[in-house]
Regions:
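Short, small-residue-biased leader/transition segments that mark boundaries at the very start
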Residues: 1-3, 755-761, 765
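Extended, charge-enriched "interface" segments that sit outside catalytic cores
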Residues: 6-177, 194
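Flexible, glycine-rich loop/tail regions that form catalytic "lids" or insertion modules at the edges
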Residues: 21, 31-41, 48-77, 217, ...
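Alpha-helix capping and helix-loop boundary segments enriched in small/acidic/polar residues
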Residues: 27, 169-176, 259-270, 288, ...
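Active-site cores of enzymes that catalyze phosphoryl transfer or operate on phosphate-rich substrates
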Residues: 134-156, 227-289, 584, 710-753
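Active-site pocket-lining segments that scaffold enzyme catalytic pockets across diverse folds
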Residues: 155, 159-219, 522-525, 534-548, ...
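Cofactor-binding active-site loop characterized by glycine-rich and histidine/acidic residues
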Residues: 195-368, 566-618
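Conserved phosphate-handling catalytic cores of large alpha/beta enzymes
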Residues: 342-353, 361-397, 402-406
């Protein structure tokens, strides 16, 4: 018998000890605690549905989840459970806890945050609604300041209505609190380190924001109404006053310097959104290191309409850019100016969601709904929004729920289509009146204070109006409007071409590109020493490298732009073993400029709009957008029509954006055969845009360099035919780059003088025949 057989027998396990039975009353207590905890979480989650948001009295929808019986508990149960058992040791009972949470979540701030993407964000909201640093009420002096601002807002609208009867102004009345909200955004952003705030908005309330937030002189606004002020002094078509932009250097109440910009925009609602993002991205660049950005330095604020926000697809397209590496701006503050009607269309016919803001939830954006008749809640909401952006670098949305006191414009009769709503509005006190009454009740102001603020604003506006009537017509304008196109030397010394070419073909020793690609790139080294052989992709790389070497930064984006839609660019190399990337154009020795290239999302309108905004704010950068093969440029037609071709005439604004439009007649069907050259030629009839159809790589090389260094900025549209990219007969020689220049028309070296004479005679004969007819 082996020793193992003599082992001691395994002892029989004794029964596991059982937990002591919980007395029935303890089980009831546990049930109460669980039910109350679920109820308290429901207040946080669904409390926004119980907030009175409509100034006109429509009751909130409520939610069954806010009823005690949903959790099998009663008011008495709330009294029986201590606050400590629920995680609130400083509160006596569960009822005290519930009342505290109701005060925070169902009173005046309707907050939606449980859909946010991280636990950290959700916990942040729980903390700020427990503490009072961000949600604290306004101090008496702050309340008086809000009264002063509301008096200025309402006073301007009333004065314009009286002085310029029948003129459109797209009044802010009903959402007046937007102005103190923007005051808060500027103040808090500057305190967080911003030196610039850039704003985009449509026509509603724009005149008030221009004057009362950006500081546009009111006398200038009055002169525009009188027809005595032309911001372009006859140099262009100009635009209606509620489309114009403005820039100003201001100082916050705390003494911090701040540059504030309102971006000009067309009537096409929301299409300015990506333009704002691109402008902000450009201005966030570090002045000393072009690859570094300070997202705290520039804060974008995007103001939307309640009908356009869910209705216009550009909103979602722009949201999708928010966290992409090529487009992030560190968060945007969004405000929906929600007057609960789209021209004459009711919400039931303009969206398929409960709230106008629901689209934002799909992008994990926190939302606060506020009643526009409660300026204090509006200011607190903006305070929270700026703090959230500063903390997380993400977008935040405020839904400002108000009304529109007049029709779509002041000449419109809204009672035709919304008779009941406008009966309520006619009998509803203004935001300023309600706020003044509240301050009187609270003892913060006297009736004389409230009336005095109103009279002071009216008297000031009357003085400005009288002065504007006799002031000379403004004579300042865009002196550079007719700036001529200057000659640019686009050739590059052959030794520099060889140097940058070698840099383009150099990568780290440990880096392994695809072997087939290495063979293609090696050919680029060989052709620099031989006659002919430079193709389009090679010429582009040399153009970019030489532009960078001359101190101009480059930004190129588009669908599949890194590789190139025809696999001709390969600006970004990939290591076949590790997947790591290497961008040779970012390693040109001795350059202080930056090369940025990004594959864009599958969007044309938003991405082109973004690049347009970037190009406006970064005149020292060659900015390019490349369409995907398939004639997809027409998807971005609003950006082309309203910004690229018309910005100079309407707003005196310049862009040097380059559009690269790959296409060709290779039997690929009607969707891949035309970049619509004829449309661009029509749009460029006033020399507001440059259009080129290069037929060889050298032409492409020179036109890119000319665009990079041309002082007179215009958009450049470049047709890029697919069939010529690698065509042997269309290749260029190295000396075409070092000795040549861009040719508006390429002469045919094979033509004969005799043929030219015959052609001229034929032309003259045809002209005579036409004249005789």
């Amino acid at each position: 018998m082996c020793s193992s057989d003599l082992a001691a027998p395994t002892p029989v396990a004794s029964p596991a000890p059982q937990p002591p039975a919980v007395p029935m009353h303890d089980q009831d207590f546990a049930r109460r605690v669980v039910g109350i905890s679920r109820y308290l979480n429901a207040i946080r989650r669904y409390g926004f549905l119980a907030v009175q948001l409509d100034p006109l009295g429509t009751p909130p929808p409520g939610a069954v989840e806010l009823h005690l019986d949903e959790y099998g508990i009663t008011e008495a149960d709330l009294e029986l459970v201590s606050g400590e058992a629920l995680g609130f040791p400083h509160l006596k009972t569960g009822k005290d806890v519930a009342e505290r949470l109701k005060y925070r979540y169902t009173r005046n701030l309707a907050v939606e945050f449980v859909h946010c993407g991280t636990d950290e964000e959700r916990q942040w909201f729980r903390q700020i609604f427990t503490a009072e640093q961000l949600t604290r009420p306004l101090m008496p002096d702050e309340k008086k300041k809000v009264l002063q601002r509301l008096s200025q807002v309402e006073g301007l609208e009333r004065f314009l209505a009286r002085a310029f009867v029948g003129y459109k102004r797209f009044s802010i009345e009903g959402t007046d609190a937007l102005v103190p909200m923007l005051d808060t955004a500027l103040e808090e952003s500057a305190a967080a380190g911003a030196h610039t705030v850039a704003i985009s908005m449509a026509h509603r309330g724009r005149l008030n924001v221009l004057t009362n937030v950006l500081g546009k002189p009111i006398e200038q606004l009055f002169s525009e109404f009188m027809g005595r002020h032309d911001h372009l002094v006859g140099a262009g078509t100009g635009d209606v006053k509620y489309h114009l932009g403005y820039n100003n250097d201001t100082e916050t109440r705390a003494g911090r310097k701040l540059h504030v910009t309102l971006v000009p925009n067309p009537s096409h609602l929301e299409v300015v959104n990506p333009v704002l993002q691109g402008l902000a991205r450009a201005r966030q660049r570090n002045a000393t290191d072009p690859y570094e950005r300070d997202e705290f330095a520039v804060v974008p604020i995007c103001i939307h309409g309640d009908a356009a926000f869910p209705g216009e697809g550009i909103v979602a397209e722009t949201f999708n850019l928010a966290h992409l590496r090529g487009y992030s701006v560190g968060g945007t503050l969004h405000v929906i100016v929600n007057n609960q009607v789209g021209f004459t269309t009711e919400p039931v016919d303009s969206r398929s969601t409960r709230f106008a803001s629901d689209l934002a939830k799909g992008f994990e954006m926190p939302i606060i709904h506020v009643n526009a008749d409660d300026p204090e809640a509006c200011v607190i909401a903006m305070r929270i929004a700026v703090a959230y952006r500063t903390t997380f670098g993400r977008d935040f949305l405020i839904d400002l729920v108000g009304y529109r006191r007049h029709g779509h414009n002041e000449g419109d009769e809204p009672a035709y289509t919304q008779p009941l709503t406008y009966e309520k509005i006619r009998n509803h006190a203004t935001v300023r009146q309600l706020w003044g009454e509240r301050l009187v009740r609270e003892g913060v102001a006297t009736p004389a204070d409230v009336e005095g603020a109103e009279r002071e604003v009216a008297a000031q506006l009357q003085r400005i109006y009288e002065a504007a009537k006799v002031a000379p017509v403004a004579a300042h304008g865009w002196e550079q409007f007719e700036e001529p196109m200057t000659p640019v030397v686009t050739s590059v010394r052959s030794d520099l071409l060889l140097t940058v070419n070698e840099a383009l073909l150099t990568w780290p020793d440990h880096f392994t590109p695809h072997p087939r690609l290495v063979k293609q790139l090696d050919r680029r080294r060989e052709v620099m020493d031989a006659v002919g052989g430079i193709d389009w992709g090679h010429a582009e790389a040399l153009a970019f490298a030489s532009i960078l070497a001359d101190g101009v930064s480059i930004r190129l984006t588009g669908q599949d732009a890194e590789r190139g839609t025809f696999s001709h660019r390969h600006a970004v190399l990939r290591d076949v073993r590790t997947g790591q990337s290497w961008t040779p154009l970012q390693h040109i020795a001795g350059t202080a400029s930056a090369f940025e290239i990004y594959n864009s999302p599958l969007s044309e309108t938003a991405v082109m709009g973004f690049e347009y905004g970037f190009s406006v704010a970064a005149p020292d950068t060659l900015t390019l957008w490349e369409a995907q093969f398939g004639d997809f440029v027409n998807v971005a037609q609003p950006i082309i029509d309203q910004f690229l071709t018309a910005d100079r005439a309407k707003w005196g604004q310049d862009s040097g954006l380059v559009l690269l439009l790959p296409h060709g007649f290779e039997g690929q069907g009607p969707e891949h055969s035309s970049a619509r050259l004829e449309r661009f030629l029509q749009l460029a009839a006033e020399q507001n845009m440059r259009i080129a159809y290069p037929s060889n790589p050298a032409q492409y090389f020179h036109v890119l360099r000319r665009q990079a260094f041309q002082k007179s900025r215009r958009p450049l549209v470049l047709m890029q035919p697919k069939s010529l990219l690698r065509l042997q007969q269309a290749m260029s020689r190295a000396n075409d780059l070092s000795d040549g220049a861009f040719l508006a028309v390429i002469d045919d070296p094979a033509r004969s003088e005799e043929h030219t004479s015959e052609l001229q005679s034929h032309h003259d004969l045809v002209c005579r025949l036409l004249l005789e007819k």
